[in-house]
Structure formats: structure tokens, C-alpha cells
Amino acid sequence: MKNLFIAVSVLLGWFAVIAQLVLYIINRTVSLTETLFRFFSYFTILSNILVALCFTAMLVKPKSAWGRIFTHSKVISGTVVYIIVVSAVYNLVLRQLWNPEGLQKIVDVILHSTIPMLFVAHWLFRVPKNELQWKNAFAWLLFPLLYIILVLIRGTFSDFYPYPFVDVTESGYNAVLINCAGLFIIFLVLSLLVIGTGKLISKYTGED
């Protein structure tokens, strides 16, 4: 049953990412190269790829060099933080900005709701949490920090920003930096909540 759950999650995860890429290419208004750069500029895509890699490693190569990385409890727990932020920001803030239909709507639901729920459920019931430490919260901030830096640098040259709250052209640097500071606070608080929850679960399940 565990392997079936993971296998379904692997299929759904990669299907959604690949389908979104195909749709993005089909509907592109710029060159293929620029389209690919833009596609991989979305935190949603990067986070879902991380989730798909974690699930894939669990299923096929848990003891390989790369498998040990993506099945490590700290990596999975950090990815839980990222995918929860993806789901929360999209469903609370961004969903109202467009109305996808057909395949795009299906992919949209999988990326922002289904995969996050599956991954969080797996973390809650299947991932050991006894190695989690409070300092992990700060390490997990490195990925979103690097992401924001690269998005802002590239946006300076391409004038493309994947999300309205990081759009310097529309809002200016002051507003964007305030938005980013708010996001980092959300990441930090959520990271601490994930670690705290993990410690409680570990304590009451006897992992310690």
C-alpha cells in the first residue's frame, strides 16, 4: 500500500510538471529558450519538481547517492515547507487572478492542491522526524533566498517576473523588498511550525 501511494504520487507529480511545460510551450509568446527560462522561474514548478524527485527516490533508488539526499528527513521536511507555501499563496492570493479551463485546470489543481496534500500526508505518517533541529529552519531559507535573488537579477534584464509580488516594474524595489521580507517571515514561521510538529510527533511515537 505504501509503494502504491508513492507510485501514484510519482505519476501525478511528473504528469503535472510535464503537462504544464507542454501547455506553457504551446501557449508561448516568446522564443522557446525564453519560454523555458520563464517556466523554470516559477517557485511552484521548482517546488513540485523537488517533491517529484523525493517521491521518485523513495520508489526507485532510496539507497543510491541521489536517493539518500532526496529521502533524507531534513530534505523532505524542508520541501514540505516549500510546497505548503506554494499551495497557500496560490489558493489564498493568486487563484483569483485567472480562470484556467480544461487540462490547464486539472494540472493547476494537481500542482497547487493534490501534490501538496499527498506530500504533507506522507511526511506526517511515513517520514522519521527525530533528526529535525530548530536550526534547520534557517537552512531551509537558503533555497527561497537564492530563488528571489535570481528572479530579481534575471528580471532586470528580461523584464519578466513570475509573480506580481516580485514585479519590480509594476511595484518598484521598495514594495518588492517588503513583499519578500513578508514571505521570508512566512517561510521561517512555517519552518518552525513544521519542526515543532515533527518533534511532537517524534516524541509521542517513540522515535526519540
Regions flagged by a language model, labelled:
Residues M1-L12:
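N-terminal membrane topogenic signal
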Residues L11-N27:
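Alpha-helical transmembrane segments of multi-pass membrane proteins
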Residues S31-S41, T71-S73, W98-L111, W134-F138, ...:
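Non-cytosolic membrane-interface motifs at loop->transmembrane helix junctions
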Residues S41, S158-L193:
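Membrane-interface transmembrane-helix boundary segments in multi-pass integral membrane proteins
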Residues K61-V75, V127-K135:
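Membrane-interface helix-boundary motifs at transmembrane edges
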Residues T79, I83, W140-I148, C180-L192:
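Alpha-helical transmembrane spans of integral membrane proteins, capturing the lipid-embedded, hydrophobic core
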Residues P116-L132:
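Alpha-helical transmembrane segments in multipass membrane proteins, preferentially the mid-helix core
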Residues L142-P162:
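Juxtamembrane non-transmembrane "cap" segments at the membrane-aqueous interface
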